């Protein structure tokens, strides 16, 4: 099967320099949603038609299974499909999709393909309560005879509620023949793809239809308002699927998934959470309110407290993270690790049962098991040019307000006194302290303000 995706629309109503089909829906370009659905149908050829000023489309979305053709000037949907003709295999049907209609399911498209077979013209239609603006499906004795656009429709035709979604499948050899016959003698001065219906009827080719499972599958995007509406529909669908899987959502209307979220049993997600990229939550994970989790894995029974931010992190089982914690790329936490409020961890491995509960930065570090990192501790990993690593072995106690100047190693069982600035390796099982001697000044008086 050939699949052609029309993605050349200028999108003037989007009020943006970005091509319309590259605007994100759930964190992914509209066109990418359509391409992903098309791939589920295993096409032999997949061609994207892009338009003037849309060179970003092939630049951003190039892949081995994609080919691209440019439509310039843009003279309608029929003209757009003409640009793909040299790339189409005559011996298999051609399915035509739209890059700004992102929510059509593979199941609905397969229903259309099954209806059309290899020798019929198939059209995906839908019945609308208010069909204004859409091309109407004109039937005679139940059979589709043509599609008439809104601007060209007669009053009686405007009363028709069955509309053309634009999605259709046709025998490719016949499609090429019908495209060659198209005329732009209409109100818009464009080559309408819908005019091939009349050609099919004239050739005695049966014109059949199928309908999607849901009306929203055919909704397109022409403005930021419509984009926002589709975002809510898409997020509602994701939330519904999570609920069906047994995930507890405090409010299904207040979760955003911008990628793939995989959940185990008895997962609980509070309001305002955003999941980006590939995120995996194991059994019993609890995510509190307003967390952002990007490309991360969280182990069983771990608890993420409010306002925490993860990016490319791996969290083990039974960890407690946050509130207000930040796990940056390269963070790997073993089981039962506690990362508390206003603690940032970057490119570091922290072994089991270790804790950094308050106001701490751990960067480019390897931390052993059962380590306690006191409040205000900083691993000083950057000298202005190079980044160096800090190694803290098992059973270390780091006192509050300690600075560890990397590269440095703290031996097993060592204790660092509060306020220490560590510039040399600390030996195992010993107390290391580095700070000025405390003094008390007698008869000390605070300065007084001088009146001017």
UniProtKB/Swiss-Prot annotation:
One of its GO terms (biological process) is cell morphogenesis. Mg(2+) binds at residues 100, 222. Pfam families: Hexapep (PF00132), Hexapep_2 (PF14602), NTP_transf_3 (PF12804). Residues 225-245 are annotated as: Linker. Keywords: Acyltransferase, Cell shape, Cell wall biogenesis/degradation, Cytoplasm, Magnesium, Metal-binding, Multifunctional enzyme, Nucleotidyltransferase, Peptidoglycan synthesis, Repeat, Transferase. Residues 1-224 are annotated as: Pyrophosphorylase. GO terms for molecular function: glucosamine-1-phosphate N-acetyltransferase activity; magnesium ion binding; UDP-N-acetylglucosamine diphosphorylase activity. Pathway: Nucleotide-sugar biosynthesis; UDP-N-acetyl-alpha-D-glucosamine biosynthesis; N-acetyl-alpha-D-glucosamine 1-phosphate from alpha-D-glucosamine 6-phosphate (route II): step 2/2; Nucleotide-sugar biosynthesis; UDP-N-acetyl-alpha-D-glucosamine biosynthesis; UDP-N-acetyl-alpha-D-glucosamine from N-acetyl-alpha-D-glucosamine 1-phosphate: step 1/1; Bacterial outer membrane biogenesis; LPS lipid A biosynthesis. UDP-N-acetyl-alpha-D-glucosamine binds at residues 6-9, 20, 71, 76-77, 98-100, 135, 149, 164, 222, 328, 346, 361, 372. Transmembrane segments: none annotated. Acetyl-CoA binds at residues 375, 381-382, 400, 418, 435. Coiled coil: none annotated. Its main location: cytoplasm. Residues 246-452 are annotated as: N-acetyltransferase. CDD domains: GT2_GlmU_N_bac (cd02540), LbH_GlmU_C (cd03353). Its cofactor is Mg(2+). It is found in: Cytoplasm. It is an enzyme of class 2 (transferase). It catalyses: alpha-D-glucosamine 1-phosphate + acetyl-CoA = N-acetyl-alpha-D-glucosamine 1-phosphate + CoA + H(+); N-acetyl-alpha-D-glucosamine 1-phosphate + UTP + H(+) = UDP-N-acetyl-alpha-D-glucosamine + diphosphate. Homotrimer. Catalyzes the last two sequential reactions in the de novo biosynthetic pathway for UDP-N-acetylglucosamine (UDP-GlcNAc). The C-terminal domain catalyzes the transfer of acetyl group from acetyl coenzyme A to glucosamine-1-phosphate (GlcN-1-P) to produce N-acetylglucosamine-1-phosphate (GlcNAc-1-P), which is converted into UDP-GlcNAc by the transfer of uridine 5-monophosphate (from uridine 5-triphosphate), a reaction catalyzed by the N-terminal domain. In the N-terminal section; belongs to the N-acetylglucosamine-1-phosphate uridyltransferase family. This is Bifunctional protein GlmU. It comes from Janthinobacterium sp. (strain Marseille).
């Amino acid at each position: 099967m050939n699949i052609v995706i029309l993605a050349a629309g200028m999108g003037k109503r989007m009020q943006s320099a970005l091509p319309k089909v590259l605007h994100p829906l759930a964190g992914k370009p509209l066109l990418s949603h359509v391409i992903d659905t098309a791939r589920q149908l295993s096409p032999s050829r997949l061609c994207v038609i892009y338009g003037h000023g849309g060179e970003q489309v092939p630049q951003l979305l190039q892949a081995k299974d994609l080919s691209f053709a440019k439509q310039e000037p843009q003279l309608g949907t029929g003209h757009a499909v003409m640009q793909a003709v040299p790339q189409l295999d005559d011996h298999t049907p051609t399915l035509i999709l739209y890059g700004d209609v992102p929510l059509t399911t593979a199941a609905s498209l397969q229903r259309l393909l099954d209806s059309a077979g290899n020798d019929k013209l198939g059209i995906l239609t839908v019945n609308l309560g208010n069909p204004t603006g859409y091309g109407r499906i004109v039937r005679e004795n139940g059979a589709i005879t043509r599609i008439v656009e809104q601007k060209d429709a007669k009053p009686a035709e405007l009363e028709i509620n069955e509309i053309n979604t634009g999605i259709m499948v046709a025998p490719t050899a016949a499609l090429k023949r019908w495209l060659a016959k198209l005329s732009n003698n209409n109100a818009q001065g464009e080559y309408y793809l819908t005019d091939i219906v009349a050609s099919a009827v004239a050739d005695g080719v049966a014109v059949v239809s199928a309908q999607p499972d849901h009306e929203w599958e055919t909704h397109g995007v022409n403005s930021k308002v419509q984009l926002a509406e589709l975002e809510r529909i898409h997020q509602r669908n994701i939330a519904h699927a999570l609920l069906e899987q047994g995930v507890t959502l405090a409010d299904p209307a207040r979760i955003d998934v911008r990628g793939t979220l995989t959940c185990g049993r008895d997962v609980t997600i509070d309001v305002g959470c955003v999941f980006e990229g590939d995120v995996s939550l194991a059994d019993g994970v609890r995510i509190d309110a307003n967390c952002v989790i990007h490309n991360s894995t969280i182990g069983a029974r771990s608890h993420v407290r409010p306002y925490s931010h993860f990016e490319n992190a791996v969290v083990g089982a039974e960890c407690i993270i946050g509130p207000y914690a930040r796990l940056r790329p390269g963070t790997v936490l073993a089981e039962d690790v506690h990362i508390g409020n206003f603690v940032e961890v970057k490119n570091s491995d922290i072994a089991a049962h270790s804790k950094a509960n308050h106001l701490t930065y751990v960067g480019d570090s390897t931390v052993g098991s059962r380590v306690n990192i006191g409040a205000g501790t900083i691993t000083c990993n950057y000298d202005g040019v190079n980044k160096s690593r800090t190694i803290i072995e098992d059973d270390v106690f780091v006192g509050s307000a300690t600075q560890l100047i990397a590269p440095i190693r703290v031996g097993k069982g060592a204790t660092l006194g509060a306020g220490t600035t560590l510039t040399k390796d600390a030996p195992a099982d010993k107390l290391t302290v580095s700070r000025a001697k405390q003094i008390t000044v007698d008869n000390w008086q605070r300065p007084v303000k001088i009146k001017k």
